[in-house]
């Protein structure tokens, strides 16, 4: 999991250097997200289905590339991240009291 996160952060940093653009949507190329405990939404390009994130799931990043929290959860910036109002911040989903 840590390796995946480090890889994802690398992708995010490279995306910052260039504008985020989506390829043409080809639903037949989308993978099945499998069982999604908190339901599904569309990916950052509004093409493929992805799972909403629950407690402890990664969220945020440019165009929410790391995920979107399910209803009742908020994306809280990871320790060490800068301005929490920056839409490119990576965080984890935390239940809203």
Curated annotation (Swiss-Prot):
InterPro entries on file: Growth_fac_rcpt_cys_sf (IPR009030), IGFBP-like (IPR000867), IGFBP_rP_mac25 (IPR011390)
Gene Ontology CC terms, in alphabetical order: extracellular region
The UniProt record lists the keyword Ribosomal protein: no
Entry keywords, A to Z: Disulfide bond, Glycoprotein, Immunity, Innate immunity, Secreted, Signal
GO BP of this protein: innate immune response; regulation of cell growth; regulation of signal transduction
Location in or out of the cell: Secreted
One term of GO molecular function: insulin-like growth factor binding
Keyword Ligase on entry: no
Disulfide bond annotation, renumbered to this chain: 22-45, 25-47, 30-48, 36-51, 59-75, 69-93
Glycosylation site positions: 21
Name this protein carries in UniProt: Single insulin-like growth factor-binding domain protein-1
Organism for this UniProt entry: Cupiennius salei
